[in-house]
Structure formats: structure tokens, C-alpha cells
A protein has these predicted regions:
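Non-ligating segments of multi-cofactor redox enzymes
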Residues: 1-179
């Protein structure tokens, strides 16, 4: 079984938000909500400052606190790709997973269940990339199997310095940012 992950090249991301709109459209995300978003962060120390623009989403962690705290099992790790998912009809809307997620990657859908990025597994099962990856005009996002040493994501991780968000949280995120 694959273990999906994503690599985002922060040198290429221009913050255009095509990924956000594609996700909202593909996944019928209600107006005013999003499963992914654009963040800007100033990195470094003056006078050597850089602006990092990055697309963020659920990190589909290897050690997801949102799964272990869920009282109903609605938050779970799917066998296919080891992707963190939410089963809407099992979710009671208690928000424990929202509190547990250090990345702010979840929200309560207007229908009362928690929603988040799914890595578009409905598309991936058909051999397609997630919607965000497929529309990116700068090709800054790469999706693939982290357990396949020959995958494009692994080639990128070997070729450049990368970081994850909040490594100190111990979640072992699977979204990597090339710097």
C-alpha cells in the first residue's frame, strides 16, 4: 500500500490561490470555508530576509492526534495511501479533532460534521492528481508515494532542503516544503 505525501516548492509558489479554488470546486466546499489556504511567512533575520509563500492543508500525519482523540472513530487513517479522513456520518461535531490538530486544518461544515483535506483520494484512485496539484500554474506541488524510493516526491526531497510545519508537535507530517 502507498503512503501518500506532498512536496511544495516554496520558490515556485506565487500565492495565486488556484489550488484553493480548485479544491473548493472539486470537493463542493461551502462558500466561506476552505480545505487548503495560502500562507506567507517572512523567514530569516534582517538583512537576509525571504518571503516564503506556501499552500497549506491537512498534513496527513503519520502520528495524527486528531485520530487518537476522536471518540467515535470518525477521524481515521484510511488504508489507501494512509490518508487521514473523516467519515461525516460518524462525526458528532464535538470538535476534539479540531482542538488536537496543531495545523488548524479542520473546520465544522455547516451540516455539523468536521471536514478537511482528503488529498482528493476520489481522484487519486482514478490515477489523477489531487485537484490542487492538477491546476497549479507554477507546478509547485508534487504528490506521490513516500514509500516508493523512485517516486517524484522522494526525488524532490533528496534534491533540496525541506522542512515540515511544527516538527516539534511530534505528528510526523507528510506535507514537505522545499526551501
Amino acid at each position: 500500500m502507498p503512503r501518500f505525501g506532498m512536496v511544495i516548492d516554496t520558490r515556485k509558489c506565487v500565492g495565486c490561490m488556484d489550488c484553493v479554488v480548485a479544491c473548493q470546486t472539486e470537493n463542493d466546499v461551502p462558500h466561506g470555508y476552505c480545505r487548503d489556504w495560502i500562507t506567507t511567512e517572512v523567514r530569516g533575520a534582517f538583512p537576509d530576509l525571504t518571503l516564503e509563500i506556501r499552500s497549506e492543508r491537512c498534513n496527513h500525519c503519520d502520528n495524527p492526534p486528531c485520530v487518537t482523540c476522536c471518540p467515535t472513530g470518525a477521524s481515521h487513517v484510511e488504508d489507501f495511501g494512509k490518508v487521514v479522513q473523516v467519515t461525516a456520518n460518524k462525526c458528532i461535531g464535538c470538535k476534539a479533532c479540531i482542538s488536537a490538530c496543531p495545523y488548524g486544518a479542520r473546520y465544522v461544515h455547516p451540516d455539523g460534521y468536521v471536514d478537511k483535506c482528503t488529498f482528493c483520494t476520489h481522484r487519486v484512485r482514478q490515477g489523477l492528481d489531487p485537484a490542487c496539484v492538477s491546476v497549479c500554474p507554477t507546478h509547485c506541488m508534487t504528490f506521490g508515494d513516500l514509500d516508493d524510493p523512485k517516486s517524484a516526491v522522494n526525488a524532490l526531497l533528496r534534491s533540496r532542503t525541506s522542512h515540515t510545519l511544527l516538527p516539534e508537535a511530534g505528528t510526523r507530517p507528510r506535507v514537505f516544503y522545499l526551501t
